[in-house]
């Protein structure tokens, strides 16, 4: 079996002992990061961890602690994770030429999208943090919210399928290989959500589905999300999505792997429709082939 050049480069990146997202981005400074994105992230961090010693730090010291920045001799420079999380899209693309984030809504029977935004449209930062918030806000409408009361008799608006959707979006972003073509694409159809990201699985499909094992391609990015309550503990992400499907009474998530170029695709079925995927329940399917509102503590 002969691998093409792109596959060989991907294999070499994945074999590196030092996480690639922790590497310093040379020739960039702190100004490469979007100040509004950093400020929003810090508000979420403070909301979840109000007594944490990092709350009172300056922006630069805070970003050093979460490894969005690192010291390069006497200079402070962004890490790849910091640039992806908080940078402007045009600055990110100078380090990751194939960087592209794409969200679409297709509600009809045709493939024509009804709404769309991408990291390249120039109306927002185009970074991962802001993409996460924007996408999760949009996908909330895809989830049914039956009336439920908590022990305090207040309505519970968040449910296991909401958590499953957030986990799926997080996984697509932190497991992507941003050096690979075609970008990360999330499409909301009327009956399903399809999330695909560049890069192959670092575990077998069975290991992903069974859970308990984690091998994150971008662990520094994962840590940044975890610090504000986004993303589940290592190896439990598929369980969270499975629990969401069980709550909603729909088919379990469908995981597919493609190559040339390597790509992973996950399909979620967030709500029931007449004649829809709930009839497939009973086993997982496997084929081998943040505004501040969205990033609130309740959305962890």
Task: Tell where the protein language model's regions lie, with residue ranges.
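Active-site helix-to-loop segments that bind/position phosphate- or nucleotide-bearing substrates
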Residues: 1-169, 173-182, 188-193, 202-214, ...
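Small/polar glycine-rich anion-binding or flexible loop at a beta-alpha turn
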Residues: 153, 241, 262-264
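Generic beta-strand/beta-sheet core signal
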Residues: 187-189, 196-198, 258, 267-269
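Glycine-rich/acidic phosphate-handling loop/turn and adjacent ATP-lid/helix
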Residues: 193-229, 273-284
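C-terminal amphipathic alpha-helical segment
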Residues: 226-247
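Short, low-complexity, charged/polar intrinsically disordered tails
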Residues: 231, 247-254, 259-260, 267-300
């Amino acid at each position: 079996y002969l691998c093409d050049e792109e596959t060989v480069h991907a294999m070499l990146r994945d074999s590196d002992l030092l996480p690639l997202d922790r590497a310093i981005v040379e020739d960039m400074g702190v100004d490469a990061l979007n100040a509004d994105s950093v400020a929003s992230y810090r508000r979420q961090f403070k909301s979840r961890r109000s007594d944490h010693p990092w709350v009172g730090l300056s922006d630069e010291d805070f970003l050093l602690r979460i490894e969005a920045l690192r010291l390069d001799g006497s200079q402070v420079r962004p890490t790849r994770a910091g640039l992806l999380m908080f940078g402007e899209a045009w600055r990110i693309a100078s380090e990751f030429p194939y960087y592209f984030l794409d969200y679409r809504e297709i509600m009809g029977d045709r493939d024509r999208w009804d709404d769309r935004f991408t990291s390249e449209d120039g109306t927002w930062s185009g970074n991962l943090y802001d993409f996460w918030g924007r996408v999760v806000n949009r996908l909330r409408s895809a989830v049914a919210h039956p009336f439920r009361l908590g022990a305090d008799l207040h309505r519970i608006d968040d449910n296991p399928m909401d958590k499953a959707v957030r986990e799926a979006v997080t996984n697509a972003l932190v497991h992507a290989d941003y050096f690979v073509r075609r970008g990360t694409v999330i499409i909301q159809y009327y009956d399903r959500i399809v999330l695909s990201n560049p890069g192959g699985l670092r575990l077998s499909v069975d290991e992903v589905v069974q859970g308990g094992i984690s091998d994150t391609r971008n662990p520094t990015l994962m840590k940044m999300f975890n610090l504000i309550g986004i993303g589940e503990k290592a190896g439990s992400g598929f369980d969270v999505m499975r629990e969401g499907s069980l709550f909603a009474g729909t088919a379990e998530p469908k995981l597919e792997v493609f190559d040339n170029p390597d790509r992973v695709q996950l399909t979620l079925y967030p709500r029931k429709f007449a004649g829809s995927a709930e009839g497939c329940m009973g086993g997982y399917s496997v084929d081998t082939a943040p505004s501040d509102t969205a990033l609130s503590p309740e959305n962890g």
